[in-house]
């Protein structure tokens, strides 16, 4: 009985830890605008993967070209 309870708590703890981890592009969703298809612009890269398509560039980024639907290609400032 105690082994079943410990196993349940272990599985619950692992599940809780995994749910807390953001995956892929979800970490930056507060800076994104959804496309009509449901995809988020922050997930798309531009300039050979060196920039991100955003509606507005962050303070530590500079605009470098444009993406579709009036989005800017934002690259980190050097």
From Swiss-Prot:
Highest taxon, organism lineage: Eukaryota
| Pfam families per record | Defensin_beta_2 (PF13841)
Question: Can you name a GO cellular component term?
Answer: extracellular region
Disulfide bond sites: 43-74, 53-67, 57-73
Biological process annotations from GO: defense response to bacterium; innate immune response
Q: Which InterPro entries match?
A: Beta_defensin_dom
Chief location bin: secreted
Show which residues constitute the signal peptide.
1-27
Q: Where in the cell is it found?
A: Secreted
Which keywords accompany this UniProt record? Antibiotic, Antimicrobial, Defensin, Disulfide bond, Secreted, Signal
The record describes the protein's role as: Has antimicrobial activity.
The family line of this record is: Belongs to the beta-defensin family.
Protein's UniProt name: Beta-defensin 105A
Q: Which organism is it from?
A: Macaca fascicularis (Crab-eating macaque)
